[in-house]
Amino acid sequence: MIRIGTRGSLLATTQAALVRDALIANGHPAELVIVNTAGDQSSASIDSLGVGVFTTALRAAIEEGCVDAAVHSYKDLPTADDPRFTVAAIPPRNDPRDAVVTRDELVLAELPAGSLVGTSSPRRAAQLRALGLGLEIRPLRGNLDTRLNRVSSGDLDAIVVARAGLARLGRLDEVTETLDPVQMVPAPAQGAIAVECRAGDSRLVAVLAALDDADTRAAVTAERVLLAELEAGCSAPVGAIAQVVESIDGEGRVFEELSLRGCVAALDGSDVIRASGISTSGRASELGLAVAVELFELGARELMWGARSDRARGS
């Protein structure tokens, strides 16, 4: 029996159940084990709780032998490698885009100036402010039902959340608008899940590897290398989106390339720096590094230091 560690939220257990069911379909009995994390036990902002708020307890459960593997929302994993563990599988990614849910079924551009928009993410907040719509951004915590209820109750006019979460819980009918990544660059690895286990457990690594999707792994690798090179945590105002796309060479032959777009935003929305690049899936890490270097050359370091200062002051 493969014991799969997961947070206890409905979204987390739904994601983990996809992995469990895939393992069972492949002939490997599996079960879910709920692990409480610091992020689930605190109502403080994610930014204030620090790196690994949703993942440290799951990794500890693996190390202590309480579970054999853990399922993470990949965007929650620290970018620094931990040699004790390996991401043995990255299943096919769900839609990585952000989605808007409004009380009056308006799209974002139709919301009146001064509308209250909730988000848990400095990245979303910064990019929303950069749109220049005069929206009032409010902090947002809690599970997905809690967040949606803040709109239906009239507490907020709108929220911006990951479309993937709504899809996994069968709540896409709540979506008013799905934001184009050009308008709102998603978080690195948004919509992807990571299945992690002990690095030395070669048998389990091989079993889990059957669930891996090569295109998803290439995309999130490029995105997370960019994030790591910027030395920005998962709560930083950094966006990145990569995808495998088809291109045609000079002789009309179709081939695949990996494209990557990244951005760094000032928290007040006064500036957004963007860069992009294209390479092959086999050079995903090099692509992430190259786009990060371009962002640095355009002034990303100064913009991020300003964002860190703003967060330290509580603005």
From Swiss-Prot:
Keywords noted in UniProt: Porphyrin biosynthesis, Transferase
Single Gene Ontology MF annotation: hydroxymethylbilane synthase activity
GO cellular component: cytoplasm
Cofactor: dipyrromethane
Classification via SUPFAM superfamilies: Periplasmic binding protein-like II, Porphobilinogen deaminase (hydroxymethylbilane synthase), C-terminal domain
Pfam families: Porphobil_deam, Porphobil_deamC
Pathway membership: Porphyrin-containing compound metabolism; protoporphyrin-IX biosynthesis; coproporphyrinogen-III from 5-aminolevulinate: step 2/4
Residues bearing the modification S-(dipyrrolylmethanemethyl)cysteine: 234
Coiled-coil boundaries: none
Gene3D superfamilies (UniProt xref): Periplasmic binding protein-like II, Porphobilinogen deaminase, C-terminal domain
Superkingdom classification of source: Bacteria
Keyword Transmembrane helix recorded: no
Binding note for cofactor: Binds 1 dipyrromethane group covalently.
Gene Ontology biological process: protoporphyrinogen IX biosynthetic process
Enzyme Commission designation: 2.5.1.61
Catalytic activity: 4 porphobilinogen + H2O = hydroxymethylbilane + 4 NH4(+)
Family membership noted in the UniProt record: Belongs to the HMBS family.
Additional facts recorded: The porphobilinogen subunits are added to the dipyrromethane group.
The protein's role, per its UniProt record: Tetrapolymerization of the monopyrrole PBG into the hydroxymethylbilane pre-uroporphyrinogen in several discrete steps.
HAMAP family in the record: Porphobil_deam (MF_00260)
Subunit structure: Monomer.
NCBIfam families: hemC
Protein name: Porphobilinogen deaminase
Organism: Mycobacterium leprae (strain TN)
